[in-house]
Amino acid sequence: MKFVDEAEIRVDAGDGGNGCISFRREKYIPFGGPDGGDGGDGGSVYLVASDNLNTLADFRFHSHFRAQRGENGSGNNCTGKSGEDCFIHVPTGTIVTDADTGEHMGDLTRSGDRLLVARGGFHGIGNARFKSSTNRAPRRATPGTPGERRTLHLELKLIADVGLLGMPNAGKSSLIRAVSAARPKVADYPFTTLHPNLGVVRVGDQRSFVMADIPGLIEGAAEGAGLGVQFLKHLTRTRLLLHVVDIDPYETGINPVTAARKVIAELCKWGHGLEEKPRWLVLNKIDRLAPELLESRCREIIDGLHWTDPVYRISAIQGEGLDRLTRDVMRFLEQQERRSDAEQE
């Protein structure tokens, strides 16, 4: 399925049913009085977050949603049936904005979250409700009010704990394939990854975290070059970034330090708080270098970047160093959760 992270939809809530003008007519009761019932309320439209969806692509083919209209009231004080609500399922992580006014309506960050986006119309009142001591036979009823109608802009920001950054062909897709059940395309050319991928990384029997892989960044990405910048927003919800660097980039011939600096520069230019997130350096493809060259190459990259945060040496293809990396990531995330819980208390 094609990955789509923005869509526009139209939602129409149901109108309220009209109140009824009716009078009781029975044998031997010539003046039965008013018995017109109220109408039913119109159905409302809700968005519901679901972990079973990961794209907004379906809304390209079905973009207009309507809730049911309330039924009109009838005689014998019968109230009209309320219209059924309309529930629209969207991926968890969807941000909802009124396309006409720009109003931020909500952010569906947890599976099962429900957001009211169009309220159904209020029911009309039947003439039985207007009877009084001075008006025994009212010939008055009110119509139902119209339901709300909106055009909504939906934007999906994937929810992941850890995000992967790096130049094209740095091995990000190989890494997420190696540590999770995600199966992004892997090939020996740039921009193999064309859209974000999510994978659940399991550490032990009971613990896990979600990892996101986005297309590689190139110089000028913040101004629109390449593919990665349009997907950087999917990393804004992450708690940790792993900067993957190819330590033996024989295909591109780009010095690893230069490549890493370009990614960092694009991250800072794009902004939105990504440059402030915790970031670990992951030196990939260590299986390609002889042991005596590996140490000097790693030291050259670390010194060239003036890197003081954690550094990991891995081979995503061979599986080297992955166990330590995933366990340390899990430990870091758990420490963050405990710190967050303590601050809330």
UniProtKB/Swiss-Prot annotation:
Where would I find the OBG-type G domain in this sequence? 160-334
Q: Where does Mg(2+) bind?
A: 173, 193
Q: Which UniProt keywords apply?
A: Cytoplasm, GTP-binding, Hydrolase, Magnesium, Metal-binding, Nucleotide-binding
Q: Which residues bind GTP?
A: 166-173, 191-195, 213-216, 284-287, 315-317
Q: Which GO terms describe its molecular function?
A: GTP binding; GTPase activity; magnesium ion binding
Catalytic activity, EC: 3.6.5.-
Residues annotated as region Disordered? 128-148
Which cofactor is recorded for it?
Mg(2+)
Q: Which GO terms describe its biological process?
A: ribosome biogenesis
A GO cellular component entry from the record: cytoplasm
Instruction: Return the similarity comment.
Output: Belongs to the TRAFAC class OBG-HflX-like GTPase superfamily. OBG GTPase family.
Q: What is this protein called?
A: GTPase Obg
Organism of origin is Methylococcus capsulatus (strain ATCC 33009 / NCIMB 11132 / Bath)
Give the gene that encodes this protein: obg
